[in-house]
């Protein structure tokens, strides 16, 4: 997989290309990265890529020509078709399912905005999709781009040491993850649940499912509304709800 970022701050991406599981996978050649700086495609010797907005208003707007040239250059670096994504608070929310879809693609170009925004004509002519990481605003698209990259790359075979890690993450199964424990057996008076030390894999699996359902019901009940429950999940969920009703009564 080739991922390119159109950005005026290429160095910011060192954190994902050099460190952690994504950095290791990059060194192993499982995925490749290139930062494309639109300043190199500016039509002025100072490298300006922004200007005042027509109609007035605060801030500066990134100009279409250098961004378009940067995107077109990025496309030439691979024989595979590229999907161009603009990280924007106006885009569709990034979800696990979207990350799964993007992980299947061979070439992603991530457009990282700065200043007050990007000329709308560039978005209409060169961007395939706008994606948001949440209902809030940050100073630029680099951090959102890296969050998207991390979410996507951990789903690419070989990036994680054990693909089961990705499969058991929150949202992979449509519900939140269960609690996890490691040594010591007791910490500040809190002990590791006995079932996890029992060695009974069937009981452990059921406990983890029950805990995932309980956590989802308490923290993200909207996820359960979208989920088609299997009989075991329905049974466990009804038991949890009955416990909650007894506590409230």
Swiss-Prot record:
EC assignment: 2.1.1.228
Gene that specifies this protein: trmD
Biological-process GO terms, alphabetical: tRNA N1-guanine methylation
Protein's UniProt keywords contain Lyase: no
Biological classification of the source: Bacteria, Pseudomonadati, Pseudomonadota, Betaproteobacteria, Neisseriales
Functional summary from the UniProt entry: Specifically methylates guanosine-37 in various tRNAs.
Pfam families in the record: tRNA_m1G_MT (PF01746)
GO MF annotation list: tRNA (guanine(37)-N1)-methyltransferase activity
GO terms for cellular component: cytosol
Protein name: tRNA (guanine-N(1)-)-methyltransferase
Binding site for S-adenosyl-L-methionine: 113, 133-138
Keyword Ribosomal protein among record annotations: no
Entry's family note: Belongs to the RNA methyltransferase TrmD family.
Localization per record: Cytoplasm
Quaternary structure annotation from Swiss-Prot or TrEMBL: Homodimer.
UniProt keyword terms in alphabetical order: Cytoplasm, Methyltransferase, S-adenosyl-L-methionine, Transferase, tRNA processing
Catalytic activity from the UniProt record: guanosine(37) in tRNA + S-adenosyl-L-methionine = N(1)-methylguanosine(37) in tRNA + S-adenosyl-L-homocysteine + H(+)
């Amino acid at each position: 997989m080739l991922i390119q970022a159109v950005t005026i701050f290429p160095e910011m991406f060192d954190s994902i290309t050099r460190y952690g599981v994504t950095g290791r996978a990059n060194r192993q050649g499982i995925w490749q990265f290139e930062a494309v700086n639109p300043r190199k495609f500016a039509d002025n010797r100072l490298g300006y890529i922004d200007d005042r907005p027509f109609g007035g208003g605060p801030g500066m707007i990134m100009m279409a020509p250098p961004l378009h040239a940067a995107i077109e250059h990025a496309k030439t670096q691979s024989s595979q078709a590229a999907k161009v994504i603009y990280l924007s608070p106006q885009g569709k929310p990034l979800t696990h399912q979207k990350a799964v879809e993007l992980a299947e693609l061979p070439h992603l170009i991530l457009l990282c905005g700065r200043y007050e925004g990007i000329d709308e004509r560039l978005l209409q002519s060169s961007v395939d999709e706008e994606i948001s990481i949440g209902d809030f605003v940050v100073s630029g698209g680099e951090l959102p781009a890296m969050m998207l990259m991390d979410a996507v790359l951990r789903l690419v075979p070989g990036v994680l040491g054990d693909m089961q890690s990705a499969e058991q993450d929150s949202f992979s199964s449509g519900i939140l993850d269960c609690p996890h424990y490691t040594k010591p057996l007791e910490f500040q008076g809190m002990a590791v649940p006995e079932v996890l030390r029992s060695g009974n894999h069937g009981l452990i699996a059921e406990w983890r499912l029950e805990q995932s359902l309980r956590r989802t019901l308490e923290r993200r009940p909207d996820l359960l509304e979208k989920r088609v429950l299997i009989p075991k999940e329905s049974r466990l969920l009804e038991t949890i709800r009955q416990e909650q009703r007894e506590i409230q009564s």
